[in-house]
Curated annotation (Swiss-Prot):
This is Microsomal glutathione S-transferase 1. It is found in: Endoplasmic reticulum membrane; Mitochondrion outer membrane. Residues 34-62, 124-128 are cytoplasmic. The keyword Transcription does not apply. It comes from Mus musculus. Expressed in the testes (at protein level). Keywords: Acetylation, Endoplasmic reticulum, Membrane, Mitochondrion, Mitochondrion outer membrane, Transferase, Transmembrane, Transmembrane helix. InterPro entries: MAPEG-like_dom_sf, Membr-assoc_MAPEG, MGST1-like. The gene is Mgst1. Its main location: endoplasmic reticulum. Its EC number is 2.5.1.18. The modification N6-acetyllysine is found at K42, K55, K60. The chain crosses the membrane at residues 10-33, 63-96, 100-123, 129-148.
Length: 155
């Protein structure tokens, strides 16, 4: 069984860790961006969230939806749907001994696609910008899954 020193010497795993940190930080930014939009536009999902703006009926008017808030929230949800599978499959892929340059290509394309997807979602850029960014990132995750299944797993 590999000890921690061996794992730290695994260049692919260290590259994955770096890119996973970048993409998780971006996803954390989306949480903050959603909160910022909610506070700036005084749009809240729950009555207790708007208690500082009044009580009773006065507070209820702040429990509503807003297109700006919903756009950021949907971009964040899309991150959750795509980044979580990338993290799981990417970790297994990293531990399977792939070529460093191939792994870096996967990680860089995924991170670039997700950052571009967020820009396309929040700006908003016309389609097919967002759709292409989604499918590029999704394709990278599928590519890693395919390579992992083909080379290392017993089916």
């Amino acid at each position: 069984m590999a000890d921690l020193r061996q794992l730290m010497d695994n260049e692919v795993l260290m590259a994955f860790t770096s890119y996973a940190t970048i993409i998780l930080t971006k996803m954390m930014f989306m949480s903050s961006a959603t909160a910022f939009q909610r506070i700036t536009n005084k749009v809240f999902a729950n009555p207790e969230d708007c208690a500082g703006f009044g009580k009773g009926e006065n507070a209820k008017k702040f429990v509503r939806t807003d297109e700006k808030v919903e756009r950021v929230r949907r971009a964040h949800l899309n991150d959750l749907e795509n980044i979580v599978p990338f993290l799981g499959i990417g970790l297994l892929y990293s531990l399977s001994g792939p070529d460093l340059s191939t792994a870096l290509m996967h990680f860089r394309i995924f991170v670039g696609a997700r950052i571009y997807h967020t820009i396309a979602y929040l700006t908003p850029l016309p389609q097919p910008n967002r759709g292409l960014a989604f499918f590029v990132g999704y394709g990278v995750t599928l590519s890693m899954a395919y390579r992992l299944l083909r080379s290392r797993l017993y089916l």
